[in-house]
């Protein structure tokens, strides 16, 4: 009888743990936002940073990762000089964590049609 109770208790515990681990309430949100530099962005003026505008919240998801999926080198240069990535080689990425709220327009120096904006809110 004790073995049967132990088995039932283990099954109940396993069911609860599976439910909790898959519940959105208990999942942590991402602390970063991805911006893609797509293939062809260096030669095709209709392509650029994807998405071109991102919104982040300080202390929640205030890190932006720019990923260069193009075969050309790119940079991420704040229009106001707040941040600058240097050249990002193909297949690499650059990360910046925003600590002040505001609107941050940026561009790619070698490819002036590539522009974007990061909007940073505080909690």
What is each of the regions a protein language model found here?
Residues 1-123:
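Extracytoplasmic copper-binding redox domains, predominantly the cupredoxin/blue-copper superfamily
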């Amino acid at each position: 009888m004790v073995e049967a109770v132990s088995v039932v208790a283990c099954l109940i515990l396993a069911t609860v743990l599976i439910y909790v681990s898959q519940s959105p309430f208990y999942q942590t949100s991402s602390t970063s936002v991805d911006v893609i530099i797509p293939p062809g962005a260096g030669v095709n003026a209709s392509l650029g940073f994807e998405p071109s505008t991102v919104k982040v919240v300080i202390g929640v998801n205030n890190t932006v990762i720019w990923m260069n999926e193009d075969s050309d080198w790119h940079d991420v240069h704040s229009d106001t000089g707040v941040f600058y990535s240097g050249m990002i080689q193909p297949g690499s990425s650059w990360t910046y964590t925003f600590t002040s709220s505001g609107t941050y327009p940026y561009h790619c120096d070698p490819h002036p049609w590539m522009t974007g904006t990061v909007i940073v809110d505080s909690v």
